[in-house]
Every structure is written in C-alpha cells, then in structure tokens.
Amino acid sequence: FIFIYAPVCHMTWHPDGLLFKYGILDFAGGTVVHMTAGFAALAGALFLGPRTESERTHEFANVPYVIIGTGLLWFGWFGFNAGSALGVNAKAANAFATTNTAAAAAMISWVLMDAMRGNKISSNGACVGAVVGLVAITPACGFVNVGESIAIGAVAAAVSNMAVHFKNKS
C-alpha cells in the first residue's frame, strides 16, 4: 500500500504530482485504484506463471450468483463514484447518471460483440460487460455527460471483448 498506492495517489491528486501537472483528471479514483490493482495483478500473474495442465479445467460459474454479485457491485459503485463529489449536488447526480449509463452501454456492447462474432450470448458476458463499463467510467464520471458516458462504456466493452477474444484464441 505505502510503496505502490500512496505514490500514485500523490502523482494523480496532489498539485505537485507528476500526473496532476500534466492535466490528468481522475474524479473517482479510476487511475489510482484500478491501475494500481491491475498492475499488481499483472505482477502476480507474471510471478506465478501459467497454470499447469491439471489446473486448466474450466468450472462453470453459478450464474444466479454472478448476476446478484454484479447487481450488488453496480449498486455499490454508485457510492464509489457519486460519493466522490463529497456532497449531494449536481456533480454527484451527474456521476450517478454517467456511472449507470456507461455500465448499461458496456453490457449491451459486450453482448452485441459476442453476437456479431457468432458466440452464444450469455448472462455472464453481460455481467462482465457491465463491470467493464463501471471500471471505464470511474475516472471520468464527474467530468462527462450522459451521452459521452455511453460512448465510453460501449467502446471500453468492445475493446475488452476483442482483447478477451484475442487472448482466448491464441
């Protein structure tokens, strides 16, 4: 925490921070929270290496739990993003609305990408798309309007879907 998260917080939000000086905007911590977690996960995966053949069997997820979990995460994300406005005001309402629309647009985009590729449409895919939209909108939710949030969610889900397809194909 101290060696990874705190320096990134300083670089992003402190007026003397490196990223702050370059004009980086991060409303609700998407850069700080999601990038540090993503790089930590990448470091862990590189350290652990690929799975052995015996670990490659894929167990199916419990679909109702995935849907419930996604709904709870989506609901909690409203507090994460809208709460970053530090008040009940227009900025919080905008963050709430953009969070919801980005997640919904990403969910639809993910499902459409699967359908265009000829894959079976699944509720798990829709849930993954929603989470992609939530992550993508987090740094921008207080700075963009609803229309822009739809574009952010849809593009993020399309790019993520293609990346997952490419990863699974190779």
Residue ranges and their predicted role:
Residues 1-170:
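Hydrophobic alpha-helical transmembrane bundles of multi-pass membrane proteins
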